[in-house]
Amino acid sequence: MVLPLLKVGSLLIKSLAKPLSKQIKIRASKSPIFHDRVVRGARLWHKLDLKLTKFNGDTTRKPVDLNVNAAIDLGTEIVSEAFLLSVAIGLLLYETSRSSEKDKKKEEALQNRFKNLEEKLEVQQETINNLTNVIEAIQSSNPNLNIYIDPNQSTKSSIAEYINTHNIKLNSLKNAQTENDYKSISSEGIPNKRISNVN
């Protein structure tokens, strides 16, 4: 997102450069104080440019002072470029700050999601432990039972069905009228029951 904004900013700077320079020239012609500051700043910049050129080994340029018109042209160009550069830097800083804030919100949302998942896993693990204790209690009270985990069925419904089935069988044994009835019910045995994992 930063690069598109920079492109828009560069186009904006190019479109505003000439009108801004023109307005600075008009203001410099009407205001003596602003005129003097623009001319003085332009001449100082020109002298610095000459010194840097000489320091780099270029001796072809002669140290000539700028006249008023040339100084105004250079000064207005410097002021307009400095202003537009500050606008571009401001846009860049704003976009960088906005992108950073957006990334921060995404990271916070991701951290909250991980936290919620961890809490759900803890609840599920606690449920599994409780159901495991129930299964162990049933097996300890009925040593001949063979209860194992079936991931394709619901644990709670399977346990309820298991208990209900054995309650019916125990009631049938208690209510058996004859020895044959008792043997018939007992011969069926206690079926093995599949207990599933928690969904």
Curated annotation (Swiss-Prot):
Q: Which residues form a coiled coil?
A: 98-141
Q: Name one Pfam family in it.
A: OPA3
Q: Which InterPro entries match?
A: OPA3-like
Q: Which GO terms describe its biological process?
A: regulation of lipid metabolic process
Recite the UniProt keywords alphabetically.
Coiled coil
Query: Which domain of life does the protein's organism represent?
Result: Eukaryota
Keyword Coiled coil among UniProt keywords = yes
**Can you list the GO cellular component terms from the UniProt entry?**
mitochondrion
Family of the protein in this entry: Belongs to the OPA3 family.
- What is this protein called in UniProt? OPA3-like protein
Q: Which organism is it from?
A: Dictyostelium discoideum (Social amoeba)
